């Protein structure tokens, strides 16, 4: 691929980003991506593709993209290529909205191995994994020079922080996504199989899961963990230097940088000698079943998007975090934050791309909240969640 230009004219941007057409057009590529991603960088890649092939590429970021795609693709309209977190791809595939993709082994080997698991649905690949999103333990280096290796160290850290008038840790505890690394240590969400997941085999009510939630309840009773704190308050308190640690993802780094905080990103501590298992989300590219441009979409994705130059352009627009393309990821790992994110991703659990995850989020979150607020016992809360998910 030729060297990418670094800017587009205002007119070109307006054409690429605000065009209202939702219908697929033969001989042109329409791409949808969320507005918080590097859509301007992606448009640069599209411009290069157009220069080389004569095929026009339109990049759009419609509101409520993930639900709108389901609506319009079902009627034969919408984009040729959609970018979204992989966990939504399972429901798209079940509805017949995504094409199976068949990249060569040579191409597959260019990407980090475990990332392909994210787009494996019933033994078929339904997209191309692009960027890896995993939460991490973020710590204030001025308050805590070294992060803990085990969660069992929290009471000792609490004693030190209390003497300084600071809090030990804050995060959005009631949100199962952020709390899963702790409560899942040594357990799992859905049983992994060769073809995907066994939705009838879930681990949220395993013996390990009950022990982990008991630990979290103990930390709450000791005043170390506060289940009443929401995401915004936790993020603000940490950015202001009032808390030693938080649990958050790469999207939070920008605000911490702006705040001038001296922070580090670490691998999660172990609990009961078991590694923490954060859920791993993969920004992925899927090809719509309604697209008449399958060959063009594959050409764009495999030979233009998945190159060091293209990913650098997108990353310069808005950071991708860790990426699946091995060559570009190696160039990013001089950033210790990205290296730690990748470690947590490798230790973590790919978010299952199955419809049952929609119930999981509500049921597991409610179980955590009810236990920590004293409304249910651990046994009752997790049994209820398990029953709801298995319905």
Report each predicted region and the residues it spans.
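Extracytoplasmic/periplasmic substrate-binding proteins
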Residues: 45, 214-293
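Conserved C-terminal helix/tail region of periplasmic/extracytoplasmic solute-binding proteins
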Residues: 344-391
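Hinge/lid segment of periplasmic solute-binding proteins
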Residues: 86-136, 146, 151-158, 265-266, ...
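Mature extracytoplasmic/periplasmic domains
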Residues: 98, 251-254, 283-359
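Glycine-centered hinge/linker elements that transmit conformational signals in sensory
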Residues: 158, 198-228
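Extracytoplasmic/periplasmic solute-binding protein
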Residues: 126-130, 135, 155-201, 243
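Short helix-initiation/N-cap motifs at beta->coil->alpha
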Residues: 61-69, 87, 152-153, 226-240
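Conserved N-terminal structural module of periplasmic/extracytoplasmic solute-binding proteins
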Residues: 8-12, 22-89, 105, 272, ...
């Amino acid at each position: 691929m030729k060297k990418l230009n670094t800017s587009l004219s205002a007119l070109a941007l307006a054409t690429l980003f605000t065009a209202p057409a939702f219908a697929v057009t033969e001989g042109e590529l329409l791409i949808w991506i969320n507005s918080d991603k590097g859509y301007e960088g992606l448009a640069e890649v599209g411009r290069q593709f157009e220069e080389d092939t004569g095929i026009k590429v339109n990049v759009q970021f419609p509101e409520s993209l993930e639900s709108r795609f389901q609506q319009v693709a079902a009627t034969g309209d919408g984009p040729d290529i959609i970018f979204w977190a992989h966990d939504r791809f399972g429901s798209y595939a079940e509805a017949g909205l995504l094409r199976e993709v068949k990249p060569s082994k040579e191409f597959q080997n260019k990407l980090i191995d475990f990332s392909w698991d994210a787009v494996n649905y019933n033994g078929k690949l339904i997209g191309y994994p692009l960027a890896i999103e995993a939460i991490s333990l973020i710590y204030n280096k001025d308050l805590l020079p070294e992060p803990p290796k085990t969660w069992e160290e929290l009471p000792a850290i609490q004693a030190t922080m209390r003497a300084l008038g600071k809090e030990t840790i804050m995060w959005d505890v009631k949100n199962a996504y952020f709390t899963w690394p702790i409560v899942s240590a040594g357990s799992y969400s859905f049983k992994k199989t060769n073809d995907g997941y066994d939705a009838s085999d879930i681990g949220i009510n395993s013996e390990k899961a009950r022990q982990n939630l008991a630990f979290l309840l103990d930390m709450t009773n000791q005043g170390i963990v506060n289940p009443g704190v929401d995401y915004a308050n936790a993020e603000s308190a940490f950015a202001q230097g009032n808390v030693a640690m938080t649990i958050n993802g790469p999207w939070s780094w920008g605000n911490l940088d702006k705040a001038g905080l001296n922070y580090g990103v670490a691998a999660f501590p172990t609990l009961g000698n078991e590694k923490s298992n954060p859920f791993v989300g993969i920004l992925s590219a899927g090809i719509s079943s309604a697209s008449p441009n399958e060959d063009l979409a594959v050409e764009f994705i495999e030979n233009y998007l998945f190159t060091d130059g293209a990913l650098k352009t997108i990353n310069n627009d808005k950071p991708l975090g860790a990426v699946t393309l091995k060559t570009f990821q190696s160039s990013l790992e001089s950033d210790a934050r990205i290296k730690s994110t990748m470690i947590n991703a490798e230790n973590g659990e790919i978010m299952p791309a199955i419809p049952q995850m929609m119930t999981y989020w509500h049921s597991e979150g409610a179980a955590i909240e009810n236990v920590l607020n004293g409304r249910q016992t651990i046994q009752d809360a997790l049994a209820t969640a398990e029953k709801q998910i298995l319905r």
